[in-house]
A protein has these predicted regions:
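Small cysteine-rich, disulfide-bonded extracellular modules of the LU/uPAR three-finger superfamily
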Residues: 1-90, 97-135
Length: 135
């Protein structure tokens, strides 16, 4: 899994705001080349099948802060999207539409195939397991 370079710069210059922006999760096959240098959504290598549509589906970001003995941790998690039908995907991209909106790349480690419902299960929304954590 990768946090994209555009996430870091977007947080610093205000172009990515988890509290107000709209985010999407797109699925990709093993033909996609996604990593921390990914800057935006791409149709190259995107998955298909079932009721999955190009560009993916909207996901809701939840921002929280927890106090620790060393200060505080702000963390962000996203809703767990699902699609019906047969879909095979190797990973996903969470992004804000437009240029330089890539947030993070999820690598499933191997192709995952569903025959009924394909769900990207996000981790628990806690300071120790949320998808993105700023310490």
């Amino acid at each position: 899994n990768y946090s994209c370079n555009t996430l870091r710069s977007g947080l610093m210059d205000g172009t990515i705001n988890f509290a107000t922006d709209t985010f999407y999760l797109a699925l990709y096959t093993n033909a996609a080349t996604l990593d921390q240098t990914t800057t935006a959504y791409t149709a190259t290598g995107e998955a298909s099948g079932g009721d999955y549509s190009p560009t993916g589906t909207q996901v809701t970001a939840t921002v929280s802060t927890a106090t620790t003995t060393n200060g505080s941790i702000t963390y962000v998690n996203f809703s767990s999207p699902s699609w019906t039908g047969e879909i095979t995907a190797r990973g996903a991209l969470i992004y804000k539409p437009g240029d330089n909106g890539a947030v993070c790349v999820l690598d499933f480690g191997a192709d995952k195939t569903s025959t009924n419902t394909f769900t990207v299960q996000m981790p628990s929304n806690t300071s120790t397991s949320a998808l993105l954590r700023l310490i």
